[in-house]
Amino acid sequence: MIIIVGGGPAGCAAALSLRKSNPDVTTLLLDDADPAAFKIGESLPADAKNMLVYLSPTLYTDFTKDIAEGVHMPCSGNASAWETPDLRETYAVSNPFGMGLHLDRARFDQCLRDAVAGTTAGSQCTVVHGVFNKVEKTEAPEYQGWIVYVRRYGSGETDTYRAKWLVDASGRKASVARKLGAKTIKTDALLAFHMLFSATASTQHDHDGRTVIEAATAGWWYTAQLPRGRRVVVYHTNDDDASAKLARKQAGFLALLDETKYISRVIAEHGYEAVAEGHGKEPRPGCTAAGSSHLVPPMEDRLTHGWLAVGDAAMAFDPLSSQGMITAMKMGCVVGDALARRLRGEPDVEDLVSQLLRTYIRVRSRYEDEKGYFYDQVSRFTGPFWESKTTA
């Protein structure tokens, strides 16, 4: 058995790719997500559609049905006030893959998990809704591998599972890898503060399907239109910046928002009002880590068994790169296929770790170059935030 901890894009892509490449492998996908909870990370590039087709034609059919029903919104392009105070437009019509999407992220992730659960007629792939508690290695002569302890939602009971390979797709917390001795190396301390806005009875209809990006004195902003008359606004700054303290509360977040030129205009012109991100909650900013990080080591092959990390657990990207979700899914595909071939005993994948490490290093190196390039374009602001981001 292979156990994948994490039911987001990386974990689901790994499960679907593994199933596609080696249908005989028994896989358990452990998911602890709340499908009703709001989640940022809503931008899906247009070329991701090809990957969904590759992973599962049924998945892509369900996804396109959701698009037709308005569950996800088309992204018409980007408008950014970055290196200059003026907005510069990039239109999706010039993209050979077409328009990207602004997702209902919780619904998209659930669609992926449904595809994993529906890939087999028997019990080859199982999705378990529960929380990863701990992992133990066993080197007994009769069984060499891992014992994983899971607390099930609902009953609260603890189940145990055995696996030869573990895939850590648990996100930035890297729950499995860190229990096995790996460490997350953070190269910056970027935070993302986010608030959800909703249309009201007096709201002017919002036809702006762009992602609008705006650099500011101590960070940068973006806004994207979401389904059901909603809009997300996100502010990025370092955790030690004075504005981070302000952004943690609604009044401070809205005051900082008022200082923007374009983002505030989108909200004001359409009459949006701040709303809670969940039922029964007060409208206040959420906060999540958004900096660059990578896991050391990101994998380990113990010959008879092993583990590896994928997605944000292995390497997490600054949202400016717009690489997080698409790269997580691509790496999930690579990992799933590599594990499938390894378990078939193909001779060219004996050194699984070396092959995947080279791939991970290439991905991270390209990302760091691109991130440095984009931040270096901004020279109109001075101060600790921009000094921390420029490479010169």
Indicate where each model-derived feature is located.
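N-terminal FAD cofactor-binding segment of flavoenzymes
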Residues: 34-83
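Glycine-rich FAD pyrophosphate-binding loop
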Residues: 3-5, 19-42
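Helix-loop-beta segment of a Rossmann-like dinucleotide-binding subdomain
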Residues: 85-104, 145-147, 230, 236-239
